[in-house]
A protein has these predicted regions:
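Start-of-helix register in tetratricopeptide repeats
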Residues: 68, 75, 114, 148, ...
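Canonical positions in the second alpha-helix
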Residues: 59, 100-101, 138-139, 172-173, ...
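Residue-level recognition of tetratricopeptide repeat
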Residues: 75, 79-82, 121, 155, ...
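Short coil turns that delineate tetratricopeptide repeat
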Residues: 64, 106, 110, 144, ...
Length: 446
């Protein structure tokens, strides 16, 4: 089993080292568009990306000072990274291109703006949220009528916990260009503020605004399915995940969504099959963590423990393998904290969670993570402090409310804790399955 697990998990790192070496050694060469090792999306989508890349490369061979082509290549790398999940390679490739375009190399401020806009997207993707916000703010100062830069501001302000600012930025984005990108952000903000029905409505608009089969449309469709899943509507969630798999076969986020549906239904063998297919399509730490949860629920504690420990080892290896001169590094503090917590090592988890929280002290997700870690350490005073903060936006996420209820009950506020757990069950009757409560020694309501 360990050999099989490691084979799956090695996909987490196999695509993250090639470019990091070549880029640092040959900064003047154009990064390659790597050959995909598997089918990912429609052939015409791949063909468009390849053609755009080749045209830009040929243009730069004729005129190395054609700065527009560096913007084009950066856009290509960002798109390819999103589709393939090879974020380390393509984020650094894109940054290398954008470094060619700044106010010192061109008097064209529109190109500078485009460079800032793309750079902010890369920094967000690599979880460098503070830098992403500063970059997006510079971009907005150059062009206040571009919807994309306000999308970056929404994302960065959400991650930094500046939720009121994010709402203002989203309103501005919607006024400029109501489309899939703006509708999906409106949905996420409504979810943050506890408006689950409104979040579903906005995400439906996002799906309707997209072209079926394209990655961004299927991302929106699977996020809509997630909203249904998290509010207890398994049938609607499954229908959307399956629809996404028809429009975009083997789409990893639809596969992992089906794994969650089957897990909730306690069909653990089916869940395991979907989770493994998702990992083979695209390795994500969250996917492998779900795999471990499924093993745990199947009663195979040894496989669950083994898988969780492998996640830690591979995340650490990824950090160790990252060159010191990498143009942009992936901040994995949250991922490491979650991995250690899932592996039953809350003391180590706390160190990484504190690093994450120090960067964004008002972010509700960062507060939720550290609150749960403190609870696992039996530090109920600090757990309650951060439970208060994680509820600041009045979220109606069932798992979040249930965790808060457990914390408040343990801290001595039984009435408040019980009410929150009841509220969580009213939102999602399947919250026990979401949190694996059957196999964990946590408070439950029967």
């Amino acid at each position: 089993m360990r050999k099989t697990t490691l084979l799956l998990l090695m996909l987490l790192l196999c695509s993250s080292t090639t470019f990091m070496t070549s880029c640092s050694d040959r900064k003047d060469q154009l990064p390659a568009l790597l050959e995909r090792k598997k089918v990912m999306g429609p052939d015409e989508e791949k063909s468009t990306i390849t053609t755009t890349y080749n045209k830009a490369v040929e243009a730069l061979k004729k005129d190395p000072n054609d700065l527009k082509q560096y913007i084009t290549l950066a856009s290509v790398f960002i798109s390819e990274g999103r589709i393939t999940g090879n974020n380390s390679y393509y984020s650094n490739a894109a940054i290398q291109m954008l470094d060619k375009v700044n106010d010192k190399t061109t008097g064209n401020m529109d190109l500078v703006f485009q460079s800032l806009s793309l750079r902010s997207a890369i920094l967000l993707n690599m979880h460098q949220f503070k830098d992403a916000l500063a970059c997006a703010q510079k971009g907005a100062a150059l062009n206040s009528m571009n919807a994309g830069i306000f999308g970056a501001l929404v994302d960065a302000n959400v991650e930094m916990g500046n939720y009121d600012e994010a709402v203002k930025d989203c309103d501005k984005m919607m006024s400029i260009r109501p489309d899939l990108r703006s509708y999906s952000r409106a949905s996420y903000l409504r979810q943050i503020y506890g408006q689950n029905a409104g979040a579903i409505s906005a995400m439906k608009m996002a799906v309707d605004a997209g072209l079926p089969g394209q990655e961004n449309t299927e991302w929106a469709r699977t996020n809509l399915a997630d909203l249904y899943l998290n509010t207890g509507n398994l049938d609607s969630a499954a229908l959307l995940y399956r629809s996404s798999l028809v429009y975009r076969p083997d789409y990893p986020f639809a596969l992992i969504g089906m794994a969650r549906v089957e897990k909730t239904k306690k069909n653990y063998d089916g869940a395991l099959d979907y989770a493994k297919k998702a990992i083979q399509a695209r390795s994500e730490v969250a996917f492998v963590s779900l795999l471990a949860d499924i093993y745990e629920l199947k009663g195979d504690a040894a496989k669950a423990k083994e898988t969780r420990n492998d996640v830690i080892a591979l995340l650490q290896q990824g950090q160790d393998d990252e060159p010191k001169d990498a143009m942009v590094k992936h901040n994995v503090s949250r991922e490491m904290a979650t991995a250690y917590l899932n592996a039953g090592q809350p003391d180590k988890a706390l160190s990484y969670a504190q690093t994450d929280l120090n960067m964004r002290p008002d972010n509700i997700d960062a507060n939720e993570l550290i609150a749960w870690i403190y609870y696992m350490q039996h530090d109920l005073t600090n757990a309650k402090i951060h439970a208060d903060k994680m509820l600041a936006t009045k979220t109606q996420n069932a798992a979040t409310l249930y965790k808060a209820g457990v914390i408040y009950s343990a801290a001595g506020d039984a009435n408040k804790g019980s009410q929150m757990m009841h509220d969580a069950l009213a939102i999602n009757p399947n919250v026990y399955q979401v949190m694996n409560l059957e196999n964990r020694n946590l408070a439950t309501i029967k």
